[in-house]
Structure formats: C-alpha cells, structure tokens
Amino acid sequence: MNIYQKVAKNIKYYRKLKGLTQDDVAESTGYSPEYIRRIESPNVKKKGFTIEAVYIISLALNVDIAYLFDEPKQG
C-alpha cells in the first residue's frame, strides 16, 4: 500500500466515523464531490491529490492531518 492509498483509506474511515457523506466533505472543503470520490478511491494514483487538499479535508473532518498519514484503521 502506497502513501496515497493510506491517506485515501484514512479519509474515508474518518469521514464515515464522523457520519459524513462525500457530498458533505465536498461542501465543507469547496472541492467537487467527484474530487472527493477520486481521493477516496483505492486506485488513487500519484498526484491524485496535494498536501494542501489533505490539510483542507483534515479541517473539514476535524482530524489532525497526521492521522491521515498513519497506518489505516480497520472499519
């Protein structure tokens, strides 16, 4: 699993933990729902998102950005 896949899994995990939809996160961040779906995709590629995007999403999820780079949680 590469770093992009780790971040993707963690964003999805914390989003669901907070009871948010991809549309909710998109609205909170100003990103399109399609962009959020692409970031959460298990097939996310290099340059699929920026550190700035991860930071903005971490604010929307109210999660420390470091947690999004940890080993993915189960769930």
Feature annotation, model-predicted:
Residues 11, 25, 36-39, 68:
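Conserved hydrophobic/aromatic packing and binding residues within compact polymer-binding modules
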Residues 44-59:
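Short, basic-rich loop-to-helix N-cap that marks the start of a DNA-contacting helix
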Residues 62-75:
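Short C-terminal boundary/hinge segments that cap the last helix of small helical domains
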Residues 10-28:
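Short basic helix-loop element that most often maps to the first helix and adjoining turn
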Residues 30-47:
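Recognition helix of helix-turn-helix/homeodomain-like DNA-binding domains
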Residues 11, 22, 33, 51-54:
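Helix-turn-helix DNA-binding elements, focusing on the entry/boundary residues of the two helices
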